């Protein structure tokens, strides 16, 4: 179909008439010039892709008229330029694509129509675990184990890169997806098919937002939604409000980018930005490097926004040059963005656009801080950490409480490790990990950690041998500058050897703790601590034996590792005493900003980025040696425990089946607030007594071969058994933490999977009751696929995290929301009732539907299908069914 906005296309350079761009200034500059820069990107994509069908003329008018329409809950389409995947979410996406090809063929269509039509990059970074640490060969041993465990998955992904066009694999050992995206994959501006246009993307990882720090609009979506984008379907989204975040002033010399982002995270959680964009402006932004901006943008999911945007400016351009991008392309990037009104001068207030609301932060008010012990938004000043932890010890069980009786606050347990005696108590640090894309992409905090390590070693300090220390950089560039600057030996001396290039501890791949440490923690019932430079610290995520976990900057991770406890006041108490009997305080070894900047200027150089990235796709010999078939249809191996054809499309026909009312459903689980996708579908270790473990054992596997839930996402039988299998799940039916529930007809307490299986055998539909922020955390599509396979037809919650709600929609599971001011408690719901949810034939977005109980009580709930497109997916039984029917016709 012809584009009605073709008249806006003109050459960027008269000397190159074949290279055009859509000049949005011609639309209506009085409105366009007032739009937030992030909304301008949405507008450009809509104008360029307008076909009067998927993207209509009225969509462009609605976006251009954002000042009015932002308050009207209006749906607009967005076609991102590309998609990125990581392997934990990428494997199920490729499994779905393979199964969809089978389904299209079965329905009489051309299976090769199932193929990405936009560029797709899949970065393998989630599989490696910290099995070995504190030894020079840790990296090689962990990488060898990664291949041993994941060979079948990797062969499958290699098949996918051959079978599907436009799919590129970045092999294991290359780095973390978001740092590789920032340093290498990001185009900033596309030059394709004769047009320049802004780079934009969605990714199957919630921290995809990190790229917004470079001025590339992107955010995390569920794997199901990403698959639809890959097949050419636009994302259907409610036109977001945009919160302007003004930064002023300069940070204190002791403050790191981590401190700034933890402060912003707490602030924006309080402001309330769920479902909104945040766009930064003000003189303070110019003080921040791209690495600092990327750190702030990375934590976007932790404060609940959809995207956190830093428009491109001179600092962005310098970063592109610094990271080895082609200088002629960088000039074109600047020229295009200036021509289309998307290049920013943060010192010029006349460029400040209109915002829905403006909030601000003076950077000089930020103090060194951590976040924890169970949520990233629970910021604690470093000066208050000791007092805060001791308060949490005795507080009621909750986000800030462990309910330890006062007479047990000083409990301790001695143990023998490597022939020496040590003592653990509440607050003892047993994991200290410099990890995650959030911080390892930032040279200032990484070099700061290295310089602190050097000073600590020079002062005679060390880390106790039982503390599990690790360094997992986000790319080879980090190792390069740590080695070249001479700080790597000091990090190694304190136990922070490079253990792998990947997410590792941040996603729960922290590996085992020493057995004597685990015994001391469990026998003493101690609240042990993990300290990590990550972005999430939900209970049970980092390690099953660390009940308290704090997010901190890399230098503070080392400081707490040396101290050995979180119960320390750094101002008043020494980090330790050296062999000479001298007390050494944190202030004695903390590097100055000038020291860090001098080292950064000398060692973080373009040649380093070029050397690392020019061989990134070919340097891994183990990956190169993998064999993979070249068939267009995947040959499923019935004996495989990693890759299995999913049951989602088994009974699919071309005929639509309209949604039906849910009649006499039982409640499988009665949950509270902030149930995360980690609770719903854990990514970490498979417990030996779990339904998933029984499944694997029955197939002849030993516990050593179980691997993790995340690595098993290509097998629906394991993932269904792993649904709600988190040992920290708090189900109100039981009033204790356990991956169990009550089978209401019999009154038996069973594992969640076993209870769901029995309900399904009895022919009973199921629902889940929940509180606020249901599904927060990772963009985990199995947190929707798993409940679907358990027979859960609907979830009734007070509110949903954005990505999880869209994943439920994508699977045809109905997200219901209590009316404002209502919840399970106010309505007197126990969860032991039977629920009938009336789904009318004339269903409309966000319609109020009736819920009837077998007690005779009735109430209204909002059906959270927010757009007409989402209702179309419901009528098809989910988004993938819709795409298969579309491709098979």
UniProtKB/Swiss-Prot annotation:
Cofactor annotation remark: Binds 1 [4Fe-4S] cluster per subunit.
A Gene Ontology term for the protein's cellular component: cytosol
InterPro entries per record: AcnA_IRP_Swivel (IPR044137), Acnase/IPM_dHydase_lsu_aba_1/3 (IPR015931), Acoase/IPM_deHydtase_lsu_aba (IPR001030), Aconitase/3IPM_dehydase_swvl (IPR015928), Aconitase/IRP2 (IPR006249), Aconitase_4Fe-4S_BS (IPR018136), Aconitase_4Fe-4S_dom (IPR036008), AconitaseA/IPMdHydase_ssu_swvl (IPR000573)
Biological function: Bifunctional iron sensor that switches between 2 activities depending on iron availability. Iron deprivation, promotes its mRNA binding activity through which it regulates the expression of genes involved in iron uptake, sequestration and utilization. Binds to iron-responsive elements (IRES) in the untranslated region of target mRNAs preventing for instance the translation of ferritin and aminolevulinic acid synthase and stabilizing the transferrin receptor mRNA.
Cellular localization per UniProt: Cytoplasm, Cytosol
Alphabetized PROSITE patterns for the sequence: ACONITASE_1, ACONITASE_2
Family note: Belongs to the aconitase/IPM isomerase family.
One example of a Gene Ontology biological process annotation: citrate metabolic process
Molecular-function annotations in GO: 4 iron, 4 sulfur cluster binding; aconitate hydratase activity; iron-responsive element binding; metal ion binding
Name listed for the protein in its UniProt record: Cytoplasmic aconitate hydratase
This enzyme's EC code(s): 4.2.1.3
Source species: Oryctolagus cuniculus (Rabbit)
Binding site for substrate: 86, 205-207, 536, 541, 699, 779-780
Catalytic activity: citrate = D-threo-isocitrate
TM stretches of this protein: none
Keywords carried by this UniProt record: 4Fe-4S, Cytoplasm, Iron, Iron-sulfur, Lyase, Metal-binding, RNA-binding, Tricarboxylic acid cycle
UniProt-annotated binding residues for [4Fe-4S] cluster: 437, 503, 506
One of the Pfam families matching this protein, by short name: Aconitase_C
Reported cofactor(s): [4Fe-4S] cluster
NCBIfam families per the UniProt record, alphabetical: aconitase_1, PRK09277.1, PRK12881.1
Oligomer and partners: Interacts (when associated with the 4Fe-4S) with FBXL5. Interacts with frataxin(81-210).
